[in-house]
Every structure is written in C-alpha cells, then in structure tokens.
Curated annotation (Swiss-Prot):
Organism field: Lactobacillus gasseri (strain ATCC 33323 / DSM 20243 / BCRC 14619 / CIP 102991 / JCM 1131 / KCTC 3163 / NCIMB 11718 / NCTC 13722 / AM63)
Residues noted as binding ATP in the record, renumbered to the chain: 85, 103-107, 504
PROSITE patterns recorded: SECA, SECA_MOTOR_DEAD
Cross-referenced Pfam families: P-loop_SecA, SecA_DEAD, SecA_PP_bind, SecA_SW
Chief place of localization: membrane
Membrane topology: Peripheral membrane protein
Sequence similarity: Belongs to the SecA family.
Source organism phylogeny: Bacteria, Bacillati, Bacillota, Bacilli, Lactobacillales
UniProt-recorded name of the protein: Protein translocase subunit SecA
Functional description taken from the UniProt entry: Part of the Sec protein translocase complex. Interacts with the SecYEG preprotein conducting channel. Has a central role in coupling the hydrolysis of ATP to the transfer of proteins into and across the cell membrane, serving as an ATP-driven molecular motor driving the stepwise translocation of polypeptide chains across the membrane.
Subcellular location: Cell membrane; Cytoplasm
Length: 799
C-alpha cells in the first residue's frame, strides 16, 4: 500500500514539475503580450486557428494561447491569472482534475484551457451544478471569449430546440450537467436529423467535479412518457380475445383450413392468430388490413391480450391479491412484491382479471452521469476536494487529481473535534460557541448534514436572540447572495452541505483582525470530502480562519461505526456525566477511519453500478448508432431492410422445420407466412408440405423482393420510398427499445435474488441481458418485416 501511495505521490510531483515548466513559458510571454494593442491581441485568435489548420497541435499553441487569454482577462475582466492558476489551467487542458482550494479562482483558471480548446471550433462545454452558476459564469467570463473573437452560448432548460442548437454550435457553451445529459437522450429520440441540438461531445470542464461525477454518479437521467396505451384499449382487446377459440388441430392434418382463431406453440410459449382469427379481428374492429402501419398499437394489444388470456395461468404465473395482479417467482413459488411484467402484459392480465388497470410511465431513454461524461473525447474537472476520491477518478474516468499549490500559504486553524455524550449537550455547546464569537463580531458559518439539524439549531438561536440566515440548498440565486455576505462582521449563517456551493465567502472590513470566518461543523459527514468542503469555506487566499467539528455519540456516523469503543473511552476518562466532553485527536482519527470505511463501501457500490450499467451502455450505443444511420440515410434503406426480412424468414422457417418432415409445425409456419409475408391465397398456393426448408426460403425471398419492387413502383418518388422505409424501422426500433429498457430494469431488480449458491449476480445479469438484447433484435426484425410486407402504401407518409 505504501508503495502505491508513493508511486501516486511521485507521479503527482512529476506532473506538477512538467506543468511548472510550461507555466514559466507562459509567464515569459507576459511583457511581449502586454505591449500588443487590443487589435493585435484579438488578431491572435484567427492566427491560432490558421496554424491549427496547417497541422500544429493545441499542445504546440498552449504557451501563446494561455498568454493571450491571460492578457485578455486583464484588459476585459480586470483580473490577471496568477502562476498557480496557469498551472491549474494546464492540468485541465491535459484532461486532469485540478484540486484548487476555495477562493483560488477556479472560474478564472478555466478561461485559459477553455480558450485554447475552443480554437478547434469543435465546442467546449463548461459544466456547472445549477443554472444560476451557468448564467453567472457565462455573463462574466463570456465577455472575455467574445472579446477574443469566440462565440459563447448558454444552454438552459427553458430554451427551445432552436435556441439550444444555437448554444451548442458556439465555440464555448455553458450548461448544467443534467441539461447536457437530457439533451443527449432527446437527440437520440428524434425522427429527423435536423431536430438534433448537440454536436459530437468534444471537451468538457466540470466545475465541482466531485459533486457531479461522484455524489451524483449513480443518479440515472430518465426520460419517461406515460405509457401511450389507454386503459380502454386493453379492455377492448381483452373483450375481443375472449370471443376466440383455439385451433387444436394437429400439424399433420391434411387440409389447409383453420380449425380455430389462434394457435399456441407451447414449447416456445408463443401464440398467434390464424387467418380465421385475423379475419375476425378485421370484422370486429372494422379494419381492411390488421397489419397496416396505423394499426401497430392495436396489434400489440391483441398480442398481449392473447398471451394474458391463454398462456399466462392464474395461480401459477400470477395471483390476484387485494385487487392486484402479483407475479409468482417460478423458481421459489413466492409472490414478488412490487414487480410488474413489462411491455403492457401486466395491464393485459389486469384487464383479463377485471381488476383496476394501473397506469405506468414508460422509460423511453436513460443514462447515468458516469456513462454520459465518459463519452467526451477529453474530460477535465475542478474542485476544492478530490484527493480523497483519487482512486475512483483514476479507475472510472481515467483522470488524475493534481493538487494545485495555493497562491498564499494557508493560515486557517483546524481544531480537533469535540465529542459530547448526547445531541442535546452537543447543540447547547454549539449555541454557546456561536454566542461567544457573535458577541465580538466574528462571522460564523455553521454546517449541518441534514435539514432537521438546521431547523433545530435555528430555533435554539432564535431563543438565544441571535439573528441568523438559514440555507437549505433550494433557492440557488438567493443562497449565493446570503453566502456572499456570510463573511461580514456579525453574520451567522446555517447551511446544509451543498448550499451555496460555487460562491466565495469574502471577509468584510475588520473581520481579519477578529480571526476571520469561524466554521462550525455540527456533525461529521460520512465522506471526508464533504467535511473538507466545509472547512475550505474559511481561510481563502491566505485569510485567517478557524474550523471545528462538534460531535455526539448519538450522531449517525458514531452510532454506525466505533460508537461503543468511544463510549468506553469516554466513561474511563470522566466520572461526572455533565463533564463528559473530550477534545482529542484520537476522536478525530477514530471518526476518519469510520469515514474511510463508508467511503470504501460507497465506492464499491458506485463501481458495481457502473459494471451493471456498462451492459446497457454497450446496447444503447448499438441501438443509437443504428438509429443514427437510419435518420442520416439520404438514398435508400433497402440494404438495411432486405437483410432484416431475409433473416426473419430464415429464423422462422428454421424454427418450425426442425427434425424430420413429419415433425414440422406446418400450421405455425403457415400462420407466420400469411400474417407476416403475404396473403392467405398465396400461402395456400405455396403448398408448403411438399417443399424442403431451403426451397421454401428461396420462394419467400422472391415474394419479399417482388413486394419491395412493387412498393418502389407505387412510390415512384425515391424520397417518399425512403420516408416509408424510415417510418417502418423507427417505429419498430423505438417501441422495442423502450420495452427492452423496461425489461432490463426488471431483470436488474430480480437478479439480486438469484445471487445464491455459486452464481455471480453480475455475470447472470450480463448473460441474461445479452440474451434479451439478441431477442429484441430478432423482434425488431420480425416486426419490421411484418410492417413492411403487410403495409398498404399511402402518399402522405410521415414519421
């Protein structure tokens, strides 16, 4: 372990040395660039762009580009980046995390690599945790980029697609992490390419990177729509299906007539309407062609109603309890609480059983921040606290954490923790401490882990007659204003962890002499990083300050880890209950070792989430890639559709013609041909009993090719034909993909139950997920075949 730590430390120093050399080069250009006129300095941007076109790299341009942005900042913003900010900027350019203490000017630091990377014209995203910070930084730092001839955009949730597209087409775009992720998902749901708003993801600098890539790493971004099926549709389909009779005739029967409306293939648990059943459906619903494009949703309802009524068995596959349909686990025979069948099957069973049909929202697209940000060509981040999570950043995001030296030495005093036996005694001591510091005018910032603690403390301060402000991370703009004033003489501010993050606390007049900002932590967070963030609120840019944590044996962390050992220690050193207070480095060490354990557990959980999510990531990339090919195609999709149709024919014919000819399932084969490939009359003429499997395939290929040619003739305009092909593929892919997301989610919830014996749940999930993906692809090809072959051409086709 010691060797690993030494290796990391040496690497850190090596990188810093390299960056220091580059920073010296940037500084050496300062005098020369200071002498340039505004016009000459502004002319550097087109000059750099030309040099990039001629083959120079961003690394080649770094010293000059940084010197340009630095001099520009002095003229436009009245701010001149220090040497340490240049080093931070270099770390960011090379795709690292720059750990910079609070107040060291992270926002200004980012302008240097943003300017350099924006010269490529491929787009730089500056990512913040909320829209207040995005708007603030865009309006302040944006002045510099515009002055240097770059375009700057702000991407907000309230914007239209056109406004978003304009923002993304700028050289520099400010946005929140959530809006970037949602725009990516929405772009992969559009039906026309020109509806997309984002360009390929090039370079991002994430502010408060630990908050986004660690604290929110497991939060999935989800776009969901109300499942479009109205409950009445399930009931209509159910009523129709209940009128049907089963065709139980043997496959070897000599006649080609149907002996019922649907046929079940029990080995594969599939059920299909016979030609007789298809005719009945057309009569019942008043349709000419059941399998026309416009009837796709109805066909889906009928399919699910058939499965619900004739394949899913009550008290075997499911039970009805208290008016609800509950799934039974086929392995254990136990009812699975809270689980539902996907793809509308659960609602179809509810319709069958006459219980209340529950509406479901359907996930149409989802991604985690971990996987979204790993798609950028280059990623960098800034924060005051990242070193404790260094291993995670390296392993998951391939980013090194570089600790940037402070511009001035840190003068803040971090006092040892104080421990009390109860919450009451702890909070009384906190109020006493605030009272004493407030009396002499020293500003106090009190950090709490939970909103309840904030409210409890606020009441106690009211009773003590101490004016104060409370922040609970709800109103970002108002919070920023309160936090800015938290360093004024006599200010008392209570804040939960995240409140006001991203805004500096500057000391008011005369506060330095009073000892600077006093920070009081009322509890240790389970992550050392969050505690360090609170400490870092004080002592910015070499200011004086003091920090201390007040703990009690009733705090969550103390109860979970090491509370008993500390209690014994407390009992030994103090006889008098009221005086059981210890101020000791031992307590601090005990707490930190507990925090390390929690951090380790949390990291393992996030790592596991990523391993599971990687299965979906691979599948999502395949589907989104194929989808992009479809919407980008400008000539014909025949090379995509015809192989789909042929693979479907191969798969279905092979499935029903296994073994000797006497074992062939001719009825199911006929049903497939007449429902998905051609009409009933042509199916009869094929006389499939007298054909071999390969000969049958050839004849079906010919029917498909003729059908294609006929449609091309009917739609003489190639653009109309292309539009028709796109309609077929996109409708099927989108419907099947959203069903698959749902099914994968169900699988993930159930897979943990299978983690018994020697089975590894992750391997189980990967294998089952792969099988389900293969099945989905097969379903897409089958549906596209049926939709294309059976659709009746109309001129007014639209997606």
């Amino acid at each position: 372990m010691a060797n690993i730590l030494k290796k990391i430390y040496d690497n850190d120093r090596r990188e810093l040395k390299k960056f220091e050399k580059l920073a010296t080069k940037v500084e050496s250009l300062a005098d020369e660039y200071e002498k340039l006129s505004d016009e000459q300095l502004q002319a550097k941007t087109p000059e750099f762009r030309k040099r990039l076109e001629k083959g120079e790299t961003l690394d080649d341009l770094l010293p000059e580009a940084f010197a340009t942005a630095r001099e520009g900042a002095k003229r436009v913003l009245g701010l001149y980046p220090f040497r340490v900010q240049i080093i931070g900027g270099i770390a960011l350019h090379y795709g690292n995390i720059a750990e910079m203490m609070t107040g060291e000017g992270k926002t200004l630091t980012a302008t240097l690599p943003v300017y350099l990377n924006a010269l490529t014209g491929k787009g730089v995203h500056v990512v913040t945790v909320n829209e207040y910070l995005s708007s603030r930084d865009e309006s302040e730092m944006g002045q510099l980029y515009k002055w240097l001839g770059l375009t700057v955009g702000l991407n907000l949730n309230s914007m239209s697609a056109d406004e978003k597209r304009d923002a993304y087409n700028c050289d520099v775009t400010y946005s929140t992490n959530s809006e970037l992720g949602f725009d990516y998902l929405r772009d992969n749901m559009v039906v026309y390419k020109d509806q997309m708003v984002q360009r390929p993801l090039n370079y991002a600098i994430i502010d408060e990177v630990d908050s986004i890539l660690i604290d929110e790493a497991r939060t999935p971004l989800i776009i969901s729509g109300q499942a479009e099926q109205a409950n009445s549709e399930y009931i209509r389909a159910d009523r129709f299906v209940k009128t049907l009779t089963e065709d139980k005739s043997d496959d070897d029967a000599d006649d080609d007539e149907d002996h019922g409306d649907y046929k079940i293939d029990w080995p594969t648990k599939t059920i299909n309407l016979t030609n007789q059943g298809i005719k009945k459906a057309c009569e019942h619903f008043g349709l000419k062609n059941l399998y026309d494009i416009d009837n796709q949703v109805l066909v889906h309802h009928i399919d699910q109603a058939l499965r619900a009524n004739y394949i899913m068995l009550k008290d075997i596959d499911y039970v009805v309890q208290n008016g609800e349909v509950m799934i039974v686990d086929s392995f254990t025979g136990r009812v699975m609480e809270g689980r539902r069948y996907s793809d509308g099957l659960h609602q179809a069973i509810e319709a069958k059983e006459g219980v209340k049909i529950q509406e479901e929202s359907k996930t149409q697209a989802t991604i985690t921040y971990q996987n979204f940000f790993r798609m950028y060509k280059k990623l960098a981040g800034m924060t005051g606290t990242a070193k404790t999570e260094e291993e995670e950043f390296r392993e998951i995001y391939n980013m090194e954490v570089i600790t940037i030296p402070t511009n001035r030495p840190i003068a803040r005093k971090d006092l040892p923790d104080i421990l009390y036996p109860t919450l009451d005694s702890k909070f009384e001591a906190v109020v006493k401490e605030i009272k004493e510091r407030h009396a002499k005018g020293q500003p106090v910032l009190v950090g709490t882990v939970a909103i309840e603690s904030s409210e409890r403390l606020s009441k106690m301060l009211d009773q003590a007659g101490i004016p104060h402000a409370v922040l609970n991370a709800k109103n970002h703009a108002k919070e920023a204003e309160i936090i800015m004033n938290a360093g004024q003489r006599g200010a008392v501010t209570i804040a939960t962890n995240m409140a006001g993050r991203g805004t500096d606390i500057k000391l008011g007049p005369g506060v330095k002499e009073l000892g600077g900002l006093a920070v009081i932590g009322t509890e240790r967070h389970e992550s050392r990083r969050i505690d360090n963030q609170l400490r870092g609120r004080s002592g910015r840019q070499g200011d004086p300050g003091v920090t201390r944590f007040y703990l009690s044996l009733e705090d969550d962390l103390m109860k979970r880890f090491g509370g008993d050992r500390v209690k014994l220690f407390l009992d030994r050193i103090s006889d008098n209950d009221d005086d059981k207070v210890i101020e000791s480095r031992m307590i601090t060490k005990q707490v930190e070792s507990a925090q390390k354990r929690v951090e380790g557990n949390n990291y393992d959980t996030r790592k596991q989430t990523l391993q599971y999510d990687d299965v979906m990531r691979t599948q999502r990339e395949i589907i989104y890639g194929e989808r992009m090919q479809v919407i980008s195609e400008e000539k014909t999709l025949k090379p995509v559709l015809m192989p789909m149709i042929k693979r479907t024919i191969d798969h279905q014919v092979d499935m029903y013609t296994q073994g000797d000819k006497k074992d062939w399932r001719n009825d199911q084969l006929r049903d497939f041909i007449s429902s998905a490939i051609t009409d009933e009359e042509t199916t009869k003429k094929l006389n499939i009993k007298h054909l071999g499997a390969e000969e049958l395939k050839k004849r079906l290929y010919k029917i498909a090719e003729d059908n294609y040619a006929e449609k091309e003739k009917q739609l003489a305009d190639p653009e109309q034909m292309l539009e028709f092909e796109k309609v077929v593929i996109l409708r099927v892919v989108d419907e099947r993909w959203t069903d698959h997301i749902d099914a994968m989610d169900q699988l993930r919830q159930s897979i943990s139950l299978r983690g018994y014996g020697q089975l590894n749940p992750l391997v189980e999930y990967q294998e089952a997920g792969y099988r389900m993906f293969e099945e989905m692809i097969s379903d897409i090809e089958f549906d596209a075949t049926r939709l294309f072959m059976k659709a009746q051409i109309r001129q007014n086709i639209s997606r």
